[in-house]
């Protein structure tokens, strides 16, 4: 994402950074920016992109969550007692969520790739890297002394194992939108009304049908009797009179004056 005259943004691979509104908003926002800055080389190397990096409140279910493969990554920055979580731990959770962009389920491939990301992070720690530009130092980072103890033993530091703390799982899962199921198109209400209207049925007068068919038996479609019956019915329909008049066989208009078109 191209940003013009935006020196405050720490990571061009992340579109937006949002902290919870309240008394700790500025501190949380700065914390998230430090996380984003630290992850920039790794995200650039592996082609990761995140639309929005958001802070979420403490909960007993997860420390981080990935929505729709990087559309939004949520991180918990404070524990149940409102204490700030160590930078290493939050960074490790962020790598975990970034890995979900590449692989959804927690399988062997996922943890193998996560180990690669963690190794890259350890290499950055060894170089003293903290971020690009003004984020290269923590002189202006208010929480530096609170969250910046590298290799914190009590929180397991950076390891190649799945991290947990206070019995809370690291990840809340990789969540994706459900695909919309296309339903078969249904007729409009107007068309349905048209289909349900009762029309005038043809051939309801059994006396006329018997006279035309010359037999109560139903004729075959391709039989001579069926063809003659269809011709007789056509002649009857073009008759201007509403009442049926028996045919005058002496009249010039007879079946012999017509032929069947195959």
From Swiss-Prot:
Its cofactor is Zn(2+). One of its GO terms (cellular component) is nucleus. The active site is at 97. Zn(2+) binds at residues 96, 100, 106. It is an enzyme of class 3 (hydrolase). Residues 178-196 have a biased composition (Basic residues). Residues 178-199 are annotated as: Disordered. Keywords: DNA damage, Hydrolase, Metal-binding, Metalloprotease, Nucleus, Protease, Zinc. It is found in: Nucleus. GO terms for biological process: DNA repair; protein-DNA covalent cross-linking repair; proteolysis; translesion synthesis. Disulfide bonds: none annotated. It holds the Pfam family WLM. Residues 8-195 form the WLM domain. The SUMO interaction motif (SIM) is important for binding to pmt3/smt3 (SUMO). Belongs to the peptidase M3 family. WSS1-like metalloprotease (WLM) subfamily. This is DNA-dependent metalloprotease WSS1 homolog. It comes from Schizosaccharomyces pombe (strain 972 / ATCC 24843). The gene is wss1.
